[in-house]
């Protein structure tokens, strides 16, 4: 397959609308999965807000990673090279680095 976006074949035309959206899996530390369908050009802040709302936690208490890199609010799936069924990992944000013992 090539990455060229020349004239779409008839096969591609049927999938064109579907191609604007991708399904992403968001997996929490407890291995729970939530699936999201997002536009390739949507800022991932919307996905992060939606996930946090479903989990009932503030957005700043979690960090979202794609392929080991932190996802910024203004990133889009297109910018990050995301594809169908890609996985976003969610971890508790850790603050501090020492104990007071």
Swiss-Prot record:
What SMART domains would the database entry show?
UBQ
Site of the Glycyl lysine isopeptide (Lys-Gly) (interchain with G-Cter in SUMO2) crosslink?
Answer: 7, 16-17, 23, 37, 39, 45-46
Q: Modified residue N-acetylserine is at which positions?
A: 2
Cross-link position, Glycyl lysine isopeptide (Lys-Gly) (interchain with G-Cter in SUMO1)?
A: 7, 25
Signal peptide range in chain numbering: none
GO cellular component assignments: cytoplasm; nuclear membrane; nuclear speck; nuclear stress granule; plasma membrane; PML body
Q: Which UniProt keywords apply?
A: Acetylation, Cell membrane, Cytoplasm, Isopeptide bond, Membrane, Nucleus, Phosphoprotein, Ubl conjugation, Ubl conjugation pathway
Any one GO molecular-function label of the UniProt entry: transcription factor binding
Residues of the Ubiquitin-like domain: 20-97
Cellular location of this protein?
Nucleus membrane; Nucleus speckle; Cytoplasm; Nucleus, PML body
GO terms under biological process: cellular response to cadmium ion; cellular response to heat; negative regulation of action potential; negative regulation of delayed rectifier potassium channel activity; protein sumoylation; roof of mouth development
Which residue ranges make up the pro-region?
A: 98-101
Q: Where is this cross-link: Glycyl lysine isopeptide (Gly-Lys) (interchain with K-? in acceptor proteins)?
A: 97
State the similarity comment: Belongs to the ubiquitin family. SUMO subfamily.
What PANTHER family does the record point to?
SMALL UBIQUITIN-RELATED MODIFIER
Any idea what job this protein has? Ubiquitin-like protein that can be covalently attached to proteins as a monomer or a lysine-linked polymer. Covalent attachment via an isopeptide bond to its substrates requires prior activation by the E1 complex SAE1-SAE2 and linkage to the E2 enzyme UBE2I, and can be promoted by E3 ligases such as PIAS1-4, RANBP2 or CBX4. This post-translational modification on lysine residues of proteins plays a crucial role in a number of cellular processes such as nuclear transport, DNA replication and repair, mitosis and signal transduction.
Give additional notes from the record. Answer: Massive conjugation to proteins occurs in brain, kidney and liver during hibernation torpor.
Q: How does it assemble?
A: Covalently attached to KCNB1; UBE2I increases cross-linking with KCNB1 and PIAS1 decreases cross-links with KCNB1. Interacts with SAE2, RANBP2, PIAS1 and PIAS2. Interacts with PRKN. Covalently attached to a number of proteins such as IKFZ1, PML, RANGAP1, HIPK2, SP100, p53, p73-alpha, MDM2, JUN, DNMT3B and TDG. Also interacts with HIF1A, HIPK2, HIPK3, CHD3, EXOSC9, RAD51 and RAD52. Interacts with USP25 (via ts SIM domain); the interaction weakly sumoylates USP25. Interacts with SIMC1, CASP8AP2, RNF111 and SOBP (via SIM domains). Interacts with BHLHE40/DEC1. Interacts with RWDD3.
Its recorded name reads: Small ubiquitin-related modifier 1
Species annotation: Ictidomys tridecemlineatus (Thirteen-lined ground squirrel)
């Amino acid at each position: 397959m090539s990455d060229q976006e020349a004239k779409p074949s008839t096969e591609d035309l049927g999938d064109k609308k579907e191609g604007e959206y991708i399904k992403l899996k968001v997996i929490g530390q407890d291995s729970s999965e939530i699936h999201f369908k997002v536009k390739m050009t949507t800022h991932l802040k919307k996905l992060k807000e939606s996930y946090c709302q479903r989990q009932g936690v503030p957005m700043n208490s979690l960090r979202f990673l794609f392929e080991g890199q932190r996802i910024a609010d203004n990133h889009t799936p297109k910018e990050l090279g995301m594809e169908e069924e890609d996985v976003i990992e969610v971890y508790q944000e850790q603050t501090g680095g020492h104990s007071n013992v």
